[in-house]
Amino acid sequence: MAARPRSHKISIPNLYCKLDKRTGKVYWQYKHPLSGRFHSLGTDENEAKQVATEANTIIAEQRTRQILSVNERLERMKGRRSDITVTEWLDKYISIQEDRLQHNELRPNSYRQKGKPIRLFREHCGMQHLKDITALDIAEIIDAVKAEGHNRMAQVVRMVLIDVFKEAQHAGHVPPGFNPAQATKQPRNRVNRQRLSLLEWQAIFESVSRRQPYLKCGMLLALVTGQRLGDICNLKFSDIWDDMLHITQEKTGSKLAIPLNLKCDALNITLREVISQCRDAVVSKYLVHYRHTTSQANRGDQVSANTLTTAFKKAKEKCGIKWEQGTAPTFHEQRSLSERLYREQGLDTQKLLGHKSRKMTDRYNDDRGKDWIIVDIKTA
């Protein structure tokens, strides 16, 4: 006589087994809880149990999502929106900013600037509901940044979080006018960095290493054109036509055409002569480029803004001038020096710098107490 089939204790819902009397084999089946249909799983008991467990999990998740979706629709029908957490809203906010970036409604630098404030907000308040955030929560984030000595970044954090809540108002996730970031105090940022004088610029220029000719080109372009660091690094020889250097400013989108005969009287050099110094035996698209292959770049490659900043800092340390800690001028200060030199020549520096307002240009003209004001004692 054939042996009696073993009994199977099945603890997994919707899993069944069936004995085939002809062959003596046990076949496993899974019954779909919604449709009632059976699905064959073969004769491997362990594999059948694993498949049934996974199927139950998937179906349970689907039913949970359906229930939540129905609840959300019911809440909307009642005129209420489900509460959204800070993390959930920040994910949507980032998506909105990416869309603005793709449609040229947001500058790349402005998009990158939002990164740290969003990260800090997520870390500090991520699990809270957006509508429950208070001015105290925002103030704690801002104060933590200020405590690290980054007052300018604290201003950026406040500015970005104000925009986060404005977008949330537009999306209907918080009531109109709800903006706890707006209620916080604007951090003060006292600028300690000194302006760069012409004598200091000349001392730094003379201390540039022979192995870094790109820094001399960058410094000359900065002083003669008055443009920002990123725009100088992006300058190409193909940007020159009609006897002018054409620049589309990365920060503002302003389009400038600077005549090559523009002359900086303080250096007794024209833009045309500076560009001639940028031309060499190395084939490159960029005015500021590597002339020698290094471990990080090949000959002719574009010099990055970070590389130019670091090289300027090293030349500044070698020039022999001592500044108090935290007050040494940066590469960007050449833009202010250029504005002051050209204003003395009588040029329209607002157009040269690409500013939309005279007020912004006047800020660059402020020497921050660097020079003495000579009192005119001549009588009429």
UniProtKB/Swiss-Prot annotation:
<keyword id="KW-0808">Transferase</keyword>
<dbReference type="GO" id="GO:0008907">
    <property type="term" value="F:integrase activity"/>
</dbReference>
<comment type="function">
    <text>Integrase is necessary for integration of the phage into the host genome by site-specific recombination. In conjunction with excisionase, integrase is also necessary for excision of the prophage from the host genome.</text>
</comment>
<dbReference type="InterPro" id="IPR015094">
    <property type="entry name" value="Integrase_lambda-typ_DNA-bd_N"/>
</dbReference>
<dbReference type="GO" id="GO:0003677">
    <property type="term" value="F:DNA binding"/>
</dbReference>
<keyword id="KW-0233">DNA recombination</keyword>
<dbReference type="GO" id="GO:0016787">
    <property type="term" value="F:hydrolase activity"/>
</dbReference>
<dbReference type="GO" id="GO:0075713">
    <property type="term" value="P:establishment of integrated proviral latency"/>
</dbReference>
<feature type="active site">
    <location>
        <position position="335"/>
    </location>
</feature>
<keyword id="KW-1160">Virus entry into host cell</keyword>
<comment type="similarity">
    <text>Belongs to the 'phage' integrase family.</text>
</comment>
<dbReference type="InterPro" id="IPR013762">
    <property type="entry name" value="Integrase-like_cat_sf"/>
</dbReference>
<keyword id="KW-0378">Hydrolase</keyword>
<feature type="active site" description="O-(3'-phospho-DNA)-tyrosine intermediate">
    <location>
        <position position="364"/>
    </location>
</feature>
<dbReference type="InterPro" id="IPR044068">
    <property type="entry name" value="CB"/>
</dbReference>
<dbReference type="Pfam" id="PF09003">
    <property type="entry name" value="Arm-DNA-bind_1"/>
</dbReference>
<dbReference type="InterPro" id="IPR050090">
    <property type="entry name" value="Tyrosine_recombinase_XerCD"/>
</dbReference>
<feature type="active site">
    <location>
        <position position="228"/>
    </location>
</feature>
<keyword id="KW-1179">Viral genome integration</keyword>
<feature type="domain" description="Tyr recombinase">
    <location>
        <begin position="191"/>
        <end position="377"/>
    </location>
</feature>
<dbReference type="GO" id="GO:0016740">
    <property type="term" value="F:transferase activity"/>
</dbReference>
<dbReference type="GO" id="GO:0046718">
    <property type="term" value="P:symbiont entry into host cell"/>
</dbReference>
<dbReference type="InterPro" id="IPR011010">
    <property type="entry name" value="DNA_brk_join_enz"/>
</dbReference>
<dbReference type="InterPro" id="IPR002104">
    <property type="entry name" value="Integrase_catalytic"/>
</dbReference>
<dbReference type="Pfam" id="PF00589">
    <property type="entry name" value="Phage_integrase"/>
</dbReference>
<feature type="active site">
    <location>
        <position position="251"/>
    </location>
</feature>
<feature type="active site">
    <location>
        <position position="332"/>
    </location>
</feature>
<protein>
    <recommendedName>
        <fullName>Integrase</fullName>
        <ecNumber>2.7.7.-</ecNumber>
        <ecNumber>3.1.-.-</ecNumber>
    </recommendedName>
</protein>
<keyword id="KW-0229">DNA integration</keyword>
<dbReference type="GO" id="GO:0006310">
    <property type="term" value="P:DNA recombination"/>
</dbReference>
<feature type="domain" description="Core-binding (CB)">
    <location>
        <begin position="84"/>
        <end position="169"/>
    </location>
</feature>
<dbReference type="GO" id="GO:0044826">
    <property type="term" value="P:viral genome integration into host DNA"/>
</dbReference>
<dbReference type="InterPro" id="IPR010998">
    <property type="entry name" value="Integrase_recombinase_N"/>
</dbReference>
<keyword id="KW-0238">DNA-binding</keyword>
<feature type="active site">
    <location>
        <position position="355"/>
    </location>
</feature>
